[in-house]
Amino acid sequence: MARTLYDKVLEDHIIDRQEYGTCLIYIDRHLVHEVTSPQAFEGLRNAGRPVRRPDCTLATVDHNIPTSPRRNFKDIATFIKEGDSSTQCETLGENIEAFGLTYFGMEDSRQGIVHVIGPEQGFTLPGTTVVCGDSHTSTHGAFGALAFGIGTSEVEHVLATQTLLQKKSKNMRIRVEGKPSAGVTSKDIALHVIGVIGTAGGTGCVIEFCGEANESLSMESRMSICNMSIEAGARAGMIAPDDITFEYLCNKPLASKGEEWDRAVAYWKTLKFDADAQYDITVDIKASDIAPTVTWGTSPQDVAPITGKTPDLDSIADPLRRLAVQRALDYIGIASNTPLEGVKIDKVFIGSCTNSRIEDLGPAAAIVKGKRVADWVDAMVVPGSALVKRQAERKGLDKIFQEAGFNWREAGCSMCLGMNPDQLKPGERCASTSNRNFKGRQGAGGRTHLLSPAMAAAAGIKGCLTDVRHMEVAGIALTGNESPRQEVVASKYDGSPEVFKSTQDTTPAVKPPQPASDSSSSGGMPAFTTLKGYAAPLDISNIDTDMIIPKQFLKTIKRTGLGSALFYSLRFDPQTGAENPAFVLKERTFRQARILVCTGPNFGCGSSREHAPWAFNDFGIRCILAPSFADIFFNNCFKNGMLPIVLPQAQLEAIAAEAQKGVEVEVDLVQQIVRNPGGEVSFDVEEFRKHCLVNGLDDIGLTMQKADKIAQFETKRTQTWPWLDGKGYKGKATKIEINGGQQKKAKLDW
């Protein structure tokens, strides 16, 4: 049977096919950061479980850390001034030490954004399964990997078992034919695609990008496209590996060498779709139709060419769509039918896991060389990793940016999501190379326009959104694959180990388990059979996770206490904290709501933060009814004993109308019926998920019953794909030898 790329990679990782179509799959690579991991490690500790495969796990700090100079860095406690941010970062370090994992901390010469360091180290490889508690894990699909974001419960599941329970997604192909026009980058392609299919267009799918425009891209450009696939609603995005991929990986620190490398490449060359493979959805786009693109609203699907205008409200027939556009324009502060070129900006941000690599910085530097940013603009460049930063500095890019008036920063997520000191002030408008333009994403009241690095650089010089094709471009020498080996002088704080080196003691140093607590342990959930109570009606489309729980509330190491943060920017004034009595959850009846009825589609789009269902649970809402859900949020609900129900629009509107009267609604999971005074409505739910909810079952405990099958798969994996095992792996958990912070005078030998 002909297979797609996704089919091939998925099938090579199936350990056990279970009833109801669920599969237990093996995870090859796990990336960990400070925001979505504390509760997972605490769950392991409470259950007395070790990390199964430390050799397949790599951790770093990126979201919370300041990107200010680190010349005087001593330790996290003194460097990070925000207490909750410092706590998360210190907690990660403690967990790394306790469980014996490889860690690129702030004192390490290889620290950076998780989705930058994985590829540049060769940790990401073709044909692998890659996960991280971060939605933009889709980035790694550029290598032909099946890479997707997961919530904290699944982070714990992977740490404990190196597996996940998954149901096969649909196959979607996006084919971009022809060569891109001058000034058009992979970021423009990605934004254009999202504009065509919408932020829910890829829901339930794994997207395979192909066609001349995609296949001719460099690896770093491919990463940008796959990074943005989550913004199209997809579970993952993939591009088949080829000679461009192999050249990029050759000699990377963690890539195989010699005969093992040849064997790996031979396998990787089989990872492409068969000629007669069938796709559930195919979208064809002409590259010639794509221009330099910019967002105008508060969703990545709100896009237009730089030569275009904001939507004309009078021409939108659908009243719900017109209302959504009006809300977006009101927030972004631009009138209907306004030309995008010439919109004045206040800040420029070049960085994020989407666009912070050397190929992103080079074209931006070429735009600004010999020029100055507009007087009223604050501009910053944040390299994606310490290695990218040093590579750029060797090329003199830092000097070019600084002479043009840009602030040259240290590596980190920075202004992408405003969990650190790099934030927009209320009303400030930013030309940003990041991936989301949600309300308040870069700072409360901040306004974000997504675009390419070259377009962002041009906006900084002109002081407004501008067409990069009208800018003079300086010549800067940038060759293709320059990053496999980085000769970096180690600092006194550099704890650079021989990565994945095994020691005599192969047992992770797990701290003694503590008694399990309801707030931390994942050793079971409250059973969900029936739920009766008030149902709060909500008529908003594309409710994103930033709206559900803003980024400032993610700085916690517990699962509880987040109910007060639920829909914070809608329930309260973000600046004063005053209540908004007009919001539904502030109405007396719905303060006690146990069910939410949303009549707008694509509920829960955005990040993988499991803090969103935690906030609902803490508030008291355990069931959400909506026309459709974003994949990761949908999955996270079940992991937390919540029931997301998909119903047709007409039925939802009828239930919402009854709920508005203040009557109670009952959800009967056993019978799969929603009851309200207006009648009964049946709903569908996957049998396995229903079984787990009704019985309050723990996924990890269920998976542990498959220990023999997991071990058998690992034996096969070592024999068939030996390059996937960490160095020193001999069938046991491999403890990593950390240098311990001793000063190393010699250059690092990668």
UniProtKB/Swiss-Prot annotation:
PROSITE patterns from the UniProt entry: ACONITASE_1, ACONITASE_2
NCBIfam families: leuC (TIGR00170), leuD (TIGR00171), PRK01641.1 (NF002458), PRK05478.1 (NF004016), PRK12466.1 (NF009116)
Molecular functions per Gene Ontology: 3-isopropylmalate dehydratase activity; 4 iron, 4 sulfur cluster binding; metal ion binding
Top enzyme class: lyase
Family: Belongs to the aconitase/IPM isomerase family.
Cofactor note as given: Binds 1 [4Fe-4S] cluster per subunit.
Reactions catalysed, as given in the entry: (2R,3S)-3-isopropylmalate = (2S)-2-isopropylmalate
Keywords: 4Fe-4S, Amino-acid biosynthesis, Branched-chain amino acid biosynthesis, Iron, Iron-sulfur, Leucine biosynthesis, Lyase, Metal-binding
Native source species: Rhizopus niveus
Listed GO biological process terms: L-leucine biosynthetic process
Gene Ontology CC entries for this record: 3-isopropylmalate dehydratase complex
Cofactor: [4Fe-4S] cluster
Residues reported in the UniProt entry to bind [4Fe-4S] cluster: 353, 413, 416
Role according to the record: Catalyzes the isomerization between 2-isopropylmalate and 3-isopropylmalate, via the formation of 2-isopropylmaleate.
Assembly notes: Monomer.
Database matches in InterPro entries: 3-IsopropMal_deHydase_lsu, 3-IsopropMal_deHydase_ssu, 3-IsopropMal_deHydtase_ssu/lsu, Acnase/IPM_dHydase_lsu_aba_1/3, Acoase/IPM_deHydtase_lsu_aba, Aconitase/3IPM_dehydase_swvl, Aconitase_4Fe-4S_BS, Aconitase_4Fe-4S_dom
Residue segments, region Disordered: 492-524
Protein name (database record): 3-isopropylmalate dehydratase
Pathway noted in the entry: Amino-acid biosynthesis; L-leucine biosynthesis; L-leucine from 3-methyl-2-oxobutanoate: step 2/4
Gene3D superfamilies listed in its UniProt record: Aconitase, domain 3, Aconitase, domain 4
Record EC number: 4.2.1.33
